Amino acid sequence: MTTRIDTKFAELKAEGRPALVTYFMGGDPDLETALKVMKALPKAGADVIELGMPFSDPMADGPAIQAAGLRPLNAGQTLAKTLYMAAEFRKEDDTTPIVMMGYYNPIYVYGVERFLTDAKASGVDGLIVVDLPSEMDAELCIPAMKAGINFIRLTTPTTDDKRLPKVLHNSSGFVYYVSMNGITGAAIADTAKVGEAVRHIKKSTDLPICVGFGVKTPEQAAAIATHADGVVVGTAIVNAIAGELDEKGKVKGDPVAAATRLVHALAESVRATRLEAAQ
């Protein structure tokens, strides 16, 4: 199968530049605002969109993304509404890949077969489910592959040579390298070490390698872009949105403008870095 993710990374490889992968939480701070953010991301320079699935117990996420998940849940966001966001986005954009990211519990409650059917119909291209290891491929990974949806794995600095083949087995779309041990939003690791890790993983797979966790500024994104096929930015975008909300999580400023300003700066920095490196 060839998905929008495969097509996008092939296009970017031909252009000689990495992808900017942007994460935000579905329904944050409310459905209407979040959908406006989603539609604005590609125009600001996002190549791939990671659409967060709100969950009450996000064990891998730091305070910013935890709060970003609780705001939409408190406003009535459901997995069905997050899928609705993807479907509405697809009415205007049929090329930007959508990767839904989150935890297995909401999918399990929704029903795996029903979820995959609805995700495919909504234009979702890939899944990142952080609490499903490769030993549980039969739960969701293999059914997703059969449905034509990429299943994207996380690798970390502690993924050793014995574990790596298991992580890569049945992976598709791209590999998400977590730049450090810890939760989302923590400090970025040494970029030289990130480069070493990416080169090591590439010995075992032809899939693109995207690096995330801790990338907050255009300068950090540029540094990572010299080593990776893609740079993932999440917490910084979530914080940009949160900065336009009042203490109750309601819109007081312009979350869409704040998010797009940041993404535009990130995109310019990422693209310029690779162009400079290629000259």
From Swiss-Prot:
Keyword hit for Iron-sulfur: no
InterPro entries, A to Z: Aldolase_TIM (IPR013785), RibuloseP-bd_barrel (IPR011060), Trp_synthase_alpha_AS (IPR018204), Trp_synthase_suA (IPR002028)
Alphabetized UniProt keyword annotations: Amino-acid biosynthesis, Aromatic amino acid biosynthesis, Lyase, Tryptophan biosynthesis
One cellular component (GO) term of this entry: cytosol
Source taxon at top rank: Bacteria
Active site: E50 (proton acceptor), D61 (proton acceptor)
PROSITE patterns recorded: TRP_SYNTHASE_ALPHA (PS00167)
EC class: lyase
EC number: 4.2.1.20
Family: Belongs to the TrpA family.
Complex and partners: Tetramer of two alpha and two beta chains.
Official protein name in the record: Tryptophan synthase alpha chain
Species name: Brucella ovis (strain ATCC 25840 / 63/290 / NCTC 10512)
